[in-house]
A protein has these predicted regions:
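Acidic, surface-exposed loops and disordered segments
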Residues: 2-257
Length: 257
C-alpha cells in the first residue's frame, strides 16, 4: 500500500523533520513517572522498526523497582539520571527467544556468531531509536546510557539475564527540567560519499568542524569549555575501551565464531 501524497507532504512531514532535527540528550527530569499505557505505546511503536530477517533480537527491561534502579545507576555511573527519570530501561540483545523458537522445531540455533552479534546490535539500535522518536514526539526527553556496559556481568545478574542475552545500553526518559541546545553535527560532506570513499576531504572539513564545535562549547548556556571535536575523539579513542567485553560476551554464549 502506498502512502498518499497528503501524508508525506505538508505539516506532518515538516513536524517530523523538525522533531528529528531537534534531538538533544536530557539528563535532568522532574521525576514525574510515565504510565504503563505510555510505555506499552512506546514499545509497540519501537517494534515497527526494521529487523534483519525479522529476527526481532531485542528485549527491554523496564526498571520500576527502586533498589534495582539505584543499583543500575551505580553500576552505570549515572545515579542522578536514574533518580529523577520518569522511566528507566535496559535494552538488550536477545537470542534466547530465538533459541527457544529453534528448540520448538528440534533445532539448536547458531547464536554465537560474529554476524549474529552484529544483527542483534543493529536490531536493538533501530528498535531503541524508534522508541526514542516516539517518546520525543510525546514531549519527553531521553538519554542513552552506554555506561550500562561498564559492568555488564553485574547488570546481567541484577536483572537475571539468561544465556544468549546481553545488555547493550540503558535509557532514561522523562519530563525535562530543561532542554539543552542541539549539538552541531558533522557537515554532510564529511559523511556522504558519492560512488567511492573520499578521505582527502577530511583535511579541510575536520578543521572547519573543529571551529564550529569550539564555538558551540564556548557559547552554550551551561558547561562551557574549550574543546574541539577531533581532540576529544583522539583522547577518547587513544586506548581500548572496556577490554572485558569480549570475555563477557563469551560468558553469555557469544563466542564470535
Amino acid at each position: 500500500m502506498c502512502l498518499s501524497n497528503n501524508y508525506i507532504k505538508g505539516d506532518v512531514h515538516v513536524e517530523t523533520r523538525e522533531l528529528l532535527r531537534s534531538h538533544s540528550s536530557v539528563r535532568k527530569y522532574t521525576g514525574e513517572q510515565i504510565s504503563k499505557e505510555t510505555v506499552i505505546d512506546l514499545i509497540e511503536t519501537a517494534q515497527m522498526a526494521a529487523s534483519s530477517h525479522f529476527v526481532q533480537a531485542y528485549s527491554v527491561i523496564w526498571v520500576t523497582d527502586a533498589d534495582k534502579k539505584k543499583k543500575l545507576g551505580e553500576l552505570s555511573k549515572n545515579e542522578f539520571q536514574f533518580g529523577t527519570a520518569g522511566g528507566s530501561f535496559l535494552f538488550c540483545v536477545d537470542f534466547k527467544r530465538l533459541h527457544v523458537a529453534g528448540q520448538m522445531h528440534g533445532v539448536d540455533i547458531v547464536a554465537d556468531s560474529a554476524e549474529n552479534v552484529l544483527v542483534g546490535v543493529a536490531d536493538v539500535s533501530l528498535f531503541a531509536q524508534n522508541f526514542v522518536i516516539a517518546a520525543e514526539a510525546k514531549g519527553y526527553g531521553i538519554c542513552y546510557i552506554g555506561g550500562a556496559r561498564n559492568n555488564p556481568k553485574d547488570i546481567s545478574e541484577l536483572f537475571n539475564l539468561p544465556e544468549y542475552v546481553f545488555p547493550l545500553f540503558a535509557l532514561t526518559i522523562g519530563t525535562p527540567t530543561k532542554r539543552n541546545e542541539t549539538k552541531p553535527r558533522l557537515p554532510v560532506a564529511a559523511v556522504l560519499h558519492e560512488n567511492e570513499y573520499n578521505i582527502e576531504q577530511y583535511e579541510t572539513l575536520l578543521p572547519a568542524y573543529d571551529a564550529t564545535m569550539e564555538n558551540y562549547y564556548a557559547s552554550r548556556s551551561s558547561n562551557q569549555k574549550m574543546a574541539t571535536w577531533t581532540k576529544q575523539m583522539a583522547d577518547f579513542l587513544v586506548e581500548q575501551k572496556r577490554p572485558f567485553i569480549k570475555d563477557f560476551l563469551a560468558s553469555q554464549g557469544f563466542t564470535w565464531k
